[in-house]
């Protein structure tokens, strides 16, 4: 349970399992006063009506592709997009990543808790600044 078979035949964690590990660690750090985080949920809510699944549209101001987790740490704004080893960004996620970086934020595609721990404890400017027009 919580595993998915990769194309290579190896078994890897599902995105939800990776996210749960990350959130557990972030909660520990938040309780220690070391950061603030918010798990975002951009999936429109659905419900059954007359035997059909009906999806509510996203709330006003909510953006498709927003990172799964937003972290504030020591003046840094960090977007974490959780993916499996083979997961890829959607076009919406790529646009949000550009917006984060253009406006001074950090954005990481993370595939493990260890990667999150490294990125949060080793602030670097890996991304190139996008020149404003």
Predicted features and spans:
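Catalytic phosphate/metal-binding cores of nucleic-acid and nucleotide-processing enzymes, i.e., regions
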Residues: 1-133
């Amino acid at each position: 349970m919580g595993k998915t078979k990769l194309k290579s035949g190896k078994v890897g964690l599902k995105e939800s399992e990776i996210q749960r590990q990350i959130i557990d660690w972030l909660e520990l750090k938040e309780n220690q006063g070391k950061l603030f985080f918010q798990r975002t949920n951009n999936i429109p809510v659905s419900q059954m009506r007359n035997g059909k699944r009906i999806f509510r549209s996203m709330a006003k101001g909510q953006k498709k592709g927003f990172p799964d987790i937003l972290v504030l740490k020591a003046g840094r704004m960090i977007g974490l997009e959780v993916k499996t080893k083979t997961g890829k960004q959607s076009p919406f996620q790529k646009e949000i990543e550009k917006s984060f970086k253009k406006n001074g934020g950090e954005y990481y595609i993370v595939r493990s808790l260890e990667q999150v721990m490294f990125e949060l404890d080793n602030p670097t400017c890996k991304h190139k600044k996008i020149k404003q027009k």
